[in-house]
């Protein structure tokens, strides 16, 4: 991926992360850059008072009545089999690409979702004799992505699941009645997913009645949890704003049917979470025979940006006390921006080859410039008569913590140009 680094990684050797205790064998698949290495072990979801930690704690409180195991997964290193194969991802799935996933080597990677731990936690329920009805997993996850104010290569998810024995229909019906009594369900909700029988998106092993029960329990529960959480935001609790929700269909390899919950926030529909009825093969593989259940995954940064009014996802990783001292544990408060430093725009244009992937370009920018780039936008695309294609990107340099000097930016831009040319084998213009 980055030839000037991979050349010395092709020979297996042990590498110890700066913030991690575990030795990892690397090979030609290794594509984890230093700016990612340095953040492993920061564990923002355990840092008391940090918005991500507070959001985790508030969500755990919301789900407390369901008697679930609360799990925090510190090590992000998982096997490729755990991250993809066990959940039913096809071998050709785009998310397996080195342009999408950070690989330690050809057999291990940095988890791309908390769903990687579902099989392990389902097995735990069975081994412990169903002392708990489900689980909540919180962890940091890693994906190569674009550069802007709402995307970052490391973010945090909470995964949750709840199961029932299919023979205990009385408990299933009673549980549904309980969640259906929630006054939060009176909030404005549009549901486009009621006609499951006509959508042809059910598992053959489950009856229509079972599928409808689990789907409704899932939607009622999550609507209540998210509504009650969002109501803690100062702008909502004061009555200054109203919130609407809607359910739509989605698709995931490990749930069927699958849904997503969206929130109408300031006139724009935003996806808050994905969820669905757990695939029976996952439950059986974990020793949960004749069980049915639901699962969901929430991106904590997306929710925190809404609730706290945090405008830039980079701020979650800031060490600036002007950020960290604004927040108290288990409390949602509105972020107060500190001085916004001036921006500086620099353009970079190049002729691409057939192997070019934008995520590889974005990764180089993050590795060279760290968190000093606010956004990267494609501003021009041109195809010559020869068939060659040229792209021009605008790089917006802006630090969250200090003013950047012109000479500093010029040096970064020159370093970036050299890395792009050498690593991506493109022709600079």
UniProtKB/Swiss-Prot annotation:
GO terms for cellular component: cytoplasm; mitochondrial matrix; mitochondrion. InterPro entries: aa-tRNA-synth_II, aa-tRNA-synth_II/BPL/LPL, Fdx_antiC-bd, Fdx_antiC-bd_sf, Phe-tRNA-synth_IIc_mito, Phenylalanyl-tRNA_Synthase. The keyword Kinase does not apply. It catalyses: tRNA(Phe) + L-phenylalanine + ATP = L-phenylalanyl-tRNA(Phe) + AMP + diphosphate + H(+). GO terms for biological process: mitochondrial translation; phenylalanyl-tRNA aminoacylation. Its main location: mitochondrion. Its EC number is 6.1.1.20. Keywords: Aminoacyl-tRNA synthetase, ATP-binding, Ligase, Mitochondrion, Nucleotide-binding, Protein biosynthesis, Transit peptide. GO terms for molecular function: ATP binding; phenylalanine-tRNA ligase activity; tRNA binding. Residues 339-429 form the FDX-ACB domain. Substrate binds at residues 115-118, 143, 150-152, 157-159, 271, 296. Gene3D superfamilies: Bira Bifunctional Protein, Domain 2, Ferrodoxin-fold anticodon-binding domain. PANTHER family: PHENYLALANINE--TRNA LIGASE, MITOCHONDRIAL (PTHR11538:SF41), PHENYLALANYL-TRNA SYNTHETASE (PTHR11538). NCBIfam families: pheS_mito. Belongs to the class-II aminoacyl-tRNA synthetase family. This is Phenylalanine--tRNA ligase, mitochondrial. It comes from Schizosaccharomyces pombe (strain 972 / ATCC 24843) (Fission yeast). The gene is mfs1.
């Amino acid at each position: 991926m980055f030839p000037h680094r991979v050349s010395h990684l092709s020979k297996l050797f042990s590498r110890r992360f700066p913030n991690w205790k575990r030795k990892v064998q690397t090979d030609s698949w290794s594509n984890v850059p230093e700016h990612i290495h340095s953040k492993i072990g920061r564990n923002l979801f355990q840092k008391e008072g940090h918005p991500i930690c507070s959001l985790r704690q508030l969500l755990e409180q919301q789900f407390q009545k369901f008697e679930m195991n609360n799990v925090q997964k510190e090590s992000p290193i998982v096997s490729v089999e755990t991250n993809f194969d066990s959940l039913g991802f096809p071998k050709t799935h785009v998310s397996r690409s080195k342009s999408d996933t950070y690989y330690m080597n050809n057999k291990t990677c940095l988890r791309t979702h908390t769903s990687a731990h579902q099989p392990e936690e389902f097995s735990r329920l069975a081994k412990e004799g169903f002392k708990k009805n489900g689980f909540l997993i919180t962890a940091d996850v890693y994906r190569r992505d674009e550069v802007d104010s709402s995307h970052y290569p490391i973010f945090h998810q909470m995964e949750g699941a709840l199961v029932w024995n299919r023979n205990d229909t009385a408990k299933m019906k009673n549980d549904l009645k309980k969640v259906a009594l929630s006054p939060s369900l009176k909030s404005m909700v549009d549901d486009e997913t009621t006609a499951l029988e006509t959508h042809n998106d059910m598992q053959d092993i489950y009856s229509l009645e079972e599928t409808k029960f689990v789907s409704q329990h899932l939607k009622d529960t999550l609507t209540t949890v998210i509504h009650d959480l969002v109501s803690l935001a100062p702008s909502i609790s004061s009555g200054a704003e109203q919130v609407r929700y809607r359910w739509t269909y989605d698709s995931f390899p490990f749930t069927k049917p699958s849904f997503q919950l969206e929130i109408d926030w300031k006139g724009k529909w935003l996806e808050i979470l994905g969820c669905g009825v757990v695939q029976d093969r996952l439950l059986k593989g974990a020793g949960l025979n004749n069980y049915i259940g639901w699962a969901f995954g929430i991106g904590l940064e997306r929710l925190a940006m809404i609730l706290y009014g945090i405008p830039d996802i980079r701020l979650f990783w800031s060490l600036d006390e002007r950020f960290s001292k604004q927040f108290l544990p288990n409390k949602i408060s509105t972020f107060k921006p500190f001085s916004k430093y001036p921006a500086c725009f620099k353009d970079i244009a190049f002729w691409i080859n057939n192997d070019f992937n934008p995520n590889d370009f974005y990764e180089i920018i993050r590795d060279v410039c760290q968190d000093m780039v606010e956004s990267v936008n494609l501003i021009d695309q041109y195809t010559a008569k020869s068939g060659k294609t040229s792209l021009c990107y605008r790089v917006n340099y802006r630090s969250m913590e200090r003013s950047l000097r012109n000479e500093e930016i010029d040096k970064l831009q020159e370093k970036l140009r050299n890395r792009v040319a050498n690593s991506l084998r493109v022709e600079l213009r």
